């Protein structure tokens, strides 16, 4: 028996009947099976080794192009989502490999400057959602247009991890919560370290139930979700847990994400993305030929794909190159 087959047998024995099983996963293009790795393990590895994943290390989480060494980036956020997700998946006997693959891919489509860049592209293009772009990357853009040929279960989880969308697997539903838990807790941790907020400013119920440290907050929310989702058909917290999560989120939007100290950089980041898009729409010959080919000649789509894939610093330097005067040695 192959190692992969043994792993698939172990899944059937050890995982919940409600879990997604690797052996049942489907791809749009069928492939020869790997002797060692399951389909979900291969998906995780393909994402991890992709160019789009590597670029996440230089993309904004909250603070645009931060100079400190310890602030979160889009990559560290992704890794924290994967860790929280795997912890909950193991407790619930769900498929950890599927959870990890979804986590690794869920933010591949994020723009430079985070949600500010996403809104900027939405403003100029009429429609742009980072979760949809994540799926476009793994289907159409990676591997010179061949994509990564991920399983439908992984792509479904990537697409449906945000907003009111609902994934078709429990693992996908789990990542939606893991994402929220991760970003609220680590963004609070970063904001406190920056001096933007202090623990005493947290809403009373948030402070009482979740505590005031990054660790205690994650622990409380993970325990709530696991206790309430055990052997259930949905992933959920209890009523109080969801209320506290929303209260914490509202606090973070008011005091951190939309706070006065971050507004100047948010406006600058938005402006950089808008002006780069306008530049390439007026100078389509300057777009990489590969990008135009992948977009099948649609210049707006090519510009959107190209700009959304830029890192923060690359976007800033590109903006300077296109719009700022150059110094000449005379």
List each language-model region with its residue ranges:
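Short active-site segment of divalent metal-dependent hydrolases/proteases
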Residues: 109-110, 182
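Short alpha-helix carrying the canonical HExxH Zn2+-binding catalytic motif
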Residues: 100-105, 177-178
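Amphipathic alpha-helical interaction segments
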Residues: 92, 111-115, 314
């Amino acid at each position: 028996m192959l190692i992969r087959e043994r792993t698939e047998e172990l899944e059937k024995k050890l995982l919940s009947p409600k879990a997604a099983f690797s052996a049942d996963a489907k791809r749009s293009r069928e492939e020869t099976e790997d002797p060692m790795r399951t389909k979900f393990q291969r998906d995780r590895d393909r994402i991890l080794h992709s160019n789009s994943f590597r670029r996440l290390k230089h993309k904004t989480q909250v603070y645009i192009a931060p100079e400190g060494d310890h602030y979160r980036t889009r990559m560290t956020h992704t890794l924290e989502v994967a860790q929280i997700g795997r912890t909950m998946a193991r407790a619930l006997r769900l498929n950890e490999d599927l959870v990890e693959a979804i986590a690794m891919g869920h933010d591949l489509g994020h723009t430079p400057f985070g949600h500010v860049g996403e809104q900027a592209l939405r403003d100029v293009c009429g429609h742009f959602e980072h979760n949809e772009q994540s799926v476009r990357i793994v289907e159409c853009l990676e591997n010179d247009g061949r994509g990564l040929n991920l399983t439908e279960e992984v792509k479904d989880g990537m697409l449906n991890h945000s907003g009111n969308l609902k994934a078709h697997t429990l693992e996908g539903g789990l990542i939606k919560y893991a994402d929220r838990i991760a970003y609220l807790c680590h963004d609070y941790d970063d904001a406190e370290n920056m001096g933007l907020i202090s623990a005493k400013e947290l809403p009373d119920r948030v402070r009482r139930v979740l505590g005031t440290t990054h660790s205690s907050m994650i622990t409380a929310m993970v325990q709530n979700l696991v206790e309430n989702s055990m052997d259930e058909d949905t992933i959920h917290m209890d009523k109080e847990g969801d209320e506290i999560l929303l209260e914490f989120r509202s606090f973070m939007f008011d005091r951190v994400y939309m706070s006065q100290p971050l507004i100047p950089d948010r406006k600058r980041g938005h402006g950089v993305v808008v002006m780069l898009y306008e530049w390439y729409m007026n100078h389509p010959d300057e777009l990489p030929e590969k990008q135009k080919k992948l977009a099948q000649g649609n210049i707006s789509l090519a510009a959107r794909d190209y700009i959304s894939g830029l890192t923060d610093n690359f976007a800033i330097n590109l903006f300077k190159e296109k719009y700022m005067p150059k110094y000449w040695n005379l």
